[in-house]
Amino acid sequence: MGLPRGPLASLLLLQVCWLQCAASEPCRAVFREAEVTLEAGGAEQEPGQALGKVFMGCPGQEPALFSTDNDDFTVRNGETVQERRSLKERNPLKIFPSKRILRRHKRDWVVAPISVPENGKGPFPQRLNQLKSNKDRDTKIFYSITGPGADSPPEGVFAVEKETGWLLLNKPLDREEIAKYELFGHAVSENGASVEDPMNISIIVTDQNDHKPKFTQDTFRGSVLEGVLPGTSVMQVTATDEDDAIYTYNGVVAYSIHSQEPKDPHDLMFTIHRSTGTISVISSGLDREKVPEYTLTIQATDMDGDGSTTTAVAVVEILDANDNAPMFDPQKYEAHVPENAVGHEVQRLTVTDLDAPNSPAWRATYLIMGGDDGDHFTITTHPESNQGILTTRKGLDFEAKNQHTLYVEVTNEAPFVLKLPTSTATIVVHVEDVNEAPVFVPPSKVVEVQEGIPTGEPVCVYTAEDPDKENQKISYRILRDPAGWLAMDPDSGQVTAVGTLDREDEQFVRNNIYEVMVLAMDNGSPPTTGTGTLLLTLIDVNDHGPVPEPRQITICNQSPVRQVLNITDKDLSPHTSPFQAQLTDDSDIYWTAEVNEEGDTVVLSLKKFLKQDTYDVHLSLSDHGNKEQLTVIRATVCDCHGHVETCPGPWKGGFILPVLGAVLALLFLLLVLLLLVRKKRKIKEPLLLPEDDTRDNVFYYGEEGGGEEDQDYDITQLHRGLEARPEVVLRNDVAPTIIPTPMYRPRPANPDEIGNFIIENLKAANTDPTAPPYDTLLVFDYEGSGSDAASLSSLTSSASDQDQDYDYLNEWGSRFKKLADMYGGGEDD
């Protein structure tokens, strides 16, 4: 066969349908092979050249219809492939020599793609094609199929007759569910061995027009400006059809407008593109003011307009264009405005506009065309009512002009879409006279005056004028004078000095200027006031001497470093530098002072040794005008060399030691006094009263043999003063018992009266109801000779209470009076 020299074209030829085919005839019309290689000689081929035969038909049968997926080729007479256009070799052909001879093998185990229409009516199962292997001459062959639609979902759609190989369709197909099935055919021998490779079986479901078109929306909405030209696009509608629109017309949708409402100005205002569904304006005359909205009934028809139809609604909104000019209503106005009123509303202008409210074509824009030479007025648009609001930008002057005639034009925010006449209004403004405030001339007056002028010296005259035509009297006074330096004559406006003007006063003077505000008042009805500003530029005089800074220095007394002090002078040139320095009050004995060449610093040096201490250096500085200022510099001299790093404090032992000794002596005296007090408290004198005094007899009843563990009783628990009294619970429901306080006699000056003083005060103490019983120091653990204490056995004495003498209770004071009365009168009972 040789090596090919031209391009090779591999074509997949699809059988579309068979017109007539008799399965029972021995001749079968089939493709030569599943893949056929055709040779085109030469680098360039002319159209119409036959390349080769690919299909073997049967005599007497009508030819089959074929199609190819390559537009460069066509099938002639149902069998021969030929070129449709001129072909050129696209890429250089690479030839690889080979000694192997290429041979073409005939294959019978091939089935062409099978086309089956959807929605078939049967009867089922329906034979589609027969699988045939050429190995059936040698052995018995059994056929089977696998794949989706056979043994996998959807199962059972197709089947095969096991022995004959007929491919069967078991139920109707739906192309919209599955458009193509890919199955595999198998051939096995009786013993189950495969005799053929699995064969691909393609089943194409051909479409039928079983679906109507569907619009994507029930209602479509679009908009277009009024007055647009024909051909302007409005919107696009879309309908879909599930049927095939590639190989058939079943899914090809054609659009049309069924009706239009309203039919104004006529019934064909819009058109729709048949294929794309684009709605456009076809006629002029869209006017929103007449028809703001159109409703179109649109329809979609499949089969390219010859099939099933569905409808939807398209609403077209006509947008407003500025085709109507605003008009003043009315066109003439008169208004009255008081003079000097700023921001005063003069008049509201009303307009009408047929365009859509609150749109740019409706919102008005006002412009003052004439009559406002002084730019006294302004006009704005009210955002809701669309009215024009005329207000005063400046105050009007009745004396200058008492009437203004204004001309105002109105347009819209959006430009007109066509040439339209504009509307103009006339406003006559009458100015009303009012009492105007006096006006200082000038409003801000600058006056130069020398600082420090004498009190009562005139500064200037500052007066105001009355804008009114009437001759009104004006009075003056100072409204604000921060330092209180000035006074103003109420009739003439004469300003005089009442204080010392000081240019260097930083609290009230800024940049040599002292600001004062003055007031003028007329006698009109009602009276009005005006203010003016008086700016006094204070001229400097040499009233301040130079001073050094800083005024405290620290310097070493050995190899000292010179101290540089800055010189400041509050005055201005020429009352400042050059400065001169001089030491006074014998400061020049140990110090020197020199002014540097620039004249802005003074150098202070220590020329003799000084011991560490603080000294006063008297430095006198004078300026160019010989204004002298004496300043005392506090100089701290340290025991050090050169620069001062640390300055140790001087030893002050001569002062500290006496102070320390005095403190120690005071502490020693306090310690001795404390010891004496403590020793005095420890001395206890036993109180031995007469033995016949029954009050001192303490009977010890605790002796019960063996002795008591506690031999000493804490007598401090019995000797309680007034400070140890229990707390009194306050009550507000019981009247308190008032106990009289005893009256003690003061100590007499005469020593002879001491005895009476002791007796009287002892009696007062004994009768004191607030004192505790036995207000004496009792020693209960004293049981020496003479003690009347006995054993507890004395309690069993046969003596009765009647043998006891209780008269001594009367001697115990008022607190035991009740007890003495109870026991003292027992025999009488």
Curated annotation (Swiss-Prot):
SMART domains cross-referenced by the UniProt entry: CA, Cadherin_pro
Signal sequence residues: 1-24
GO BP, one annotated term: positive regulation of gene expression
MF terms in GO: beta-catenin binding; cadherin binding; calcium ion binding
Membrane spanning residue stretches: 655-677
Disulfide bonds: none
Segments on the Extracellular side according to the record's topology features: 108-654
Family matches, as CDD domains: Cadherin_repeat
Cytoplasmic side: 678-829
Keywords for this protein: Calcium, Cell adhesion, Cell membrane, Cleavage on pair of basic residues, Disease variant, Ectodermal dysplasia, Glycoprotein, Hypotrichosis, Membrane, Metal-binding, Repeat, Sensory transduction, Signal, Transmembrane, Transmembrane helix, Vision
Residues carrying a glycan: N200, N566
Pfam families: CADH_Y-type_LIR, Cadherin
Role: Cadherins are calcium-dependent cell adhesion proteins. They preferentially interact with themselves in a homophilic manner in connecting cells; cadherins may thus contribute to the sorting of heterogeneous cell types.
Full protein name: Cadherin-3
